[in-house]
Regions:
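Gram-negative outer-membrane beta-barrel domains
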Residues: 3, 20-170
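Cleavable N-terminal signal peptides
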Residues: 10-11, 18-21
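Short N-terminal leader segment in a subset of presequences, especially plant chloroplast
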Residues: 9-12, 31-33
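Alpha-helical transmembrane segments and their juxtamembrane interfaces
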Residues: 12-15, 108-110
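Bacterial N-terminal signal peptides that target proteins for export
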Residues: 1-8
């Protein structure tokens, strides 16, 4: 009788341990969660308009507006053209057009630029420089540019220019 009790106790113990070890959550046709992209895709192509402020050698400050267009030639190769007008703190004005070529990533772009400009004091100049732009929202970007304005009449009026502004992309 004692061996029967011992066998019954051993059987209950084995069944109890095995039942607890095999308990698990039941999986019934669960749907996979949503898939998210690791980055936000930005299309730099198309027209844009913007406003900017500038500072240049000789303590001259400017306030300007620009219109431009960008084209993605390849996945990351950006080309564009831009025209701008500005009022300067020395009571002069300037207008310029330039082309740009650079690299566009998901939310930022870097580029080189070159063009031609005129102003009310020194007549003609050639701007060359570099710029960077970062997309802040779907259609709004922040830009920063450095330009060297090479005066085509005299080197005495050459200038270093820093521009900061916003562009609205259509």
């Amino acid at each position: 009788m004692r061996s029967l009790k011992l066998a019954l106790l051993a059987t209950v113990a084995v069944v109890g341990i095995t039942s607890a070890a095999s308990a698990a959550d039941l999986i019934i046709g669960s749907e996979p969660g949503p898939v998210y992209d690791d980055y936000a895709s930005v299309d730099w192509s198309g027209p844009y308009a913007g406003l900017w402020v500038s500072g240049q050698t000789g303590s001259i400050f400017g306030l300007g507006a620009n219109l431009g267009v960008n084209v993605l030639i390849d996945k990351n190769l950006l080309a564009g053209a831009e025209g701008s007008v500005a009022w300067l703190s020395d009571d002069s004005w300037q207008g310029q057009v330039h082309g740009k070529l650079g690299f566009a990533a998901e939310t930022f772009a870097i580029y080189g630029l070159a063009g031609i400009g005129v102003n009310s004091i020194t007549d003609a100049y050639a701007p060359v420089g570099v710029g960077a732009e970062v997309m802040l929202a779907d259609n709004l970007s922040l830009k920063a540019e450095y330009q060297y304005k090479w005066d085509l009449d005299t080197s005495a009026d050459d200038a270093h220019v820093a521009k900061f502004g916003f562009n609205w992309h259509f």
